[in-house]
Amino acid sequence: MAATALAARTRQAVWSVWAMQGRGFGSESGDNVRSSAGAVRDAGGAFGKREQAEEERYFRARAKEQLAALKKHHENEISHHAKEIERLQKEIERHKQSIKKLKQSEDDD
């Protein structure tokens, strides 16, 4: 009789361990728990306000960095196009000089 009681206790202990492993330990998300449970911002209060302020500060800084990068990109584009315009104007002037020389040689003939 004692052996069967011991076997029953052992089975119950093993089953309890399996149940705990299946359910999980700690604050892992389960079916009935929201994924944001325990989030500081959702809790409200001073910590929630602080978290919100830090997030807003982060995103403002990120937007400022992106705008600075975009401004630099546009300045580089403008510089490139200005150089290209200058190069093409020189090319036009060179062609005009060629035409002028051809006209002069034609008039000399």
Swiss-Prot record:
GO terms for biological process: erythrocyte differentiation; heme biosynthetic process; negative regulation of endothelial cell proliferation; negative regulation of hydrolase activity; negative regulation of mitochondrial ATP synthesis coupled proton transport; protein homotetramerization. The gene is ATP5IF1. Changing residue 67 to A: Impairs F(1)F(o)-ATP synthase-binding. Residues 1-25 form a transit peptide. One of its GO terms (cellular component) is mitochondrion. This is ATPase inhibitor, mitochondrial. PANTHER family: ATP SYNTHASE F1 SUBUNIT EPSILON. Changing residue 55 to A: Strongly impairs F(1)F(o)-ATP synthase-binding. It comes from Bos taurus.
